[in-house]
Curated annotation (Swiss-Prot):
One of its GO terms (molecular function) is acireductone dioxygenase (Ni2+-requiring) activity. It is an enzyme of class 1 (oxidoreductase). This is Acireductone dioxygenase. Transmembrane segments: none annotated. Belongs to the acireductone dioxygenase (ARD) family. The lineage of its organism: Bacteria, Pseudomonadati, Pseudomonadota, Gammaproteobacteria, Pseudomonadales.
Amino acid sequence: MSSLSVYHVSSPEIPNKVLTHFEDIASTLAEQGVRFDRWQAAAKIQPGASQEEVIGAYKEQIDKLMTERGYITVDVISLNSDHPQKAELRAKFLEEHRHGEDEVRFFVAGRGLFTLHIDDYVYAVLCEKNDLISVPAGTKHWFDMGENPHFVAIRLFNNPEGWVANFTGEDIAGRFPRLED
């Protein structure tokens, strides 16, 4: 089940609130300019699936988002616990960073913890299959796939180069809860 835990930056051990109802999660994130939506991930995709398989299975949804928001680049991150670079990828995504453009993720399998650092608050969004999250350009965030990743997410960008992170150098991500396997 998707959830949202909201923390003040000064108290990473205790959330101010925890939400599990879709409407509550979506409205709380919308107040911060973040889109959280439910889409139907109809095709059966397993972590480890190729980018071509995933894009082919979700072409209609991808085309809709690209047309709706003007995204020009799409890629897929598909990881399972056997991936040889899982530790390196986890470490990279766990560093707080921002992008010069919106970042959109549509989870078509598994789950991941997408954490946003906005002003004095941290919003930890547990995203699962069917969840779509769109983070505005410039929003500081990090992503945890857990020690044993199991997820497939379609990522859309306004940048032709795709995923380009500007790391903040802050260690805040290490102070907040991570995704437990």
